[in-house]
Amino acid sequence: MSNESGRFLFTSESVSMGHPDKLADRISDSILDALLAQDPHSRVACETLVTTGLAVIAGEISSKADVDYEKIVRDTIVAVGYDDPDIGIDGKTCEVQIRLDAQSPDIAQGVNSDEASGKDIGAGDQGLMFGYACKDTPELMPLPIALSHRIINRITEARFNKEVDWLRPDNKSQVTVEYDGNRPVRIEAVVVSAQHGPDVSHDEIEKFVIENVVKPSIPAELDKGDIKYHINPTGKFIIGGPHGDCGLTGRKIIVDTYGGWGRHGGGAFSGKDSTKVDRSAAYMARYVAKNIVAAGLAERCEVQLAYAIGVTEPVSVHVDTEGTGKIEDAKLCELIREHFPLTPGGIIDHLQLRRPVFVETTAGGHFGRDGEGFTWEKTDKADALAEAAGATATA
């Protein structure tokens, strides 16, 4: 997205770990992590469906690991906060169906090449993946999605800390930011839907959410005193989670990425091991874009990588700095190929993606995060890129 002049509004949303689609993501990645903990070379494509009183796990898994799938499903549902049938699903008593097969040998033959050394692994599928970074926030994320995540993280913290007794697991946020060119200047509107128990008034919910959730989460300088608040705008939100809506793995791909700012290749992340470039190459694309911005080579940067199934090298690399680049985008493409490993095996090794680190990605977004597991958020290539770009510019 390029808009160097003029004012405009942009909106992004986030959802909590108790949202039915996010609960499904969390179950899928909990299974992935359990398998990787025992067998780092596990091949996993695990999909989850959750609805009233039922969780269904289906997909393709090839692994030497021996895990109790049903226990993982139940433990995950309870840990999120669904431990009472009155709120839609109880992990202790709900029905759990497991429908898992081995990975197709037709897919495996294109991926297995020299896997013992971790090199020359072919891509697990064709596809295109995007990464994005910008200077809106310290974590180099677009501000609307960053603020939406902060609000969700804060309401989740309030629920787990029992700051009030009426909060339930299913929560949503949405933030509209006004920009002047590429600069965020004010917050236009905030929407929060907070699932709650039956014995609380709308006024109490609204006051708590605005004063204790939203205001601590947004920059004071962007609050001009005229924010439009929409807190539980339907009036009540008692029925939620899998009881209110059926949840499926992979249905919150915009929440998982950049909130609609920049493009998306269409592939979901959760439940997939890192031979699936839908996940690993999207992480690498973010890593590349973030390092380009951190190096001062652009204010905004979108990177596209594209792959063919069974083929090691990407079929294309594309960069779009939205007119903010300090050197030509074509030169940045050359630097990317020189400084970043772009084969599936190289990505897996460099970002250490065979570790059981993925369940933490399922709430709060996959990008703009802290923590040891989020290796794709490092900016350890920035200095080398800046130096190489300087040499390129003077050559």
UniProtKB/Swiss-Prot annotation:
It is an enzyme of class 2 (transferase). It catalyses: L-methionine + ATP + H2O = S-adenosyl-L-methionine + phosphate + diphosphate. The keyword Metal-binding applies. Its cofactor is Mg(2+); K(+). It comes from Rhodopirellula baltica (strain DSM 10527 / NCIMB 13988 / SH1). It comes from the Bacteria. Catalyzes the formation of S-adenosylmethionine (AdoMet) from methionine and ATP. The overall synthetic reaction is composed of two sequential steps, AdoMet formation and the subsequent tripolyphosphate hydrolysis which occurs prior to release of AdoMet from the enzyme. One of its GO terms (molecular function) is magnesium ion binding. It is found in: Cytoplasm. ATP binds at residues 19, 170-172, 236-237, 245, 251-252, 268, 272. This is S-adenosylmethionine synthase.
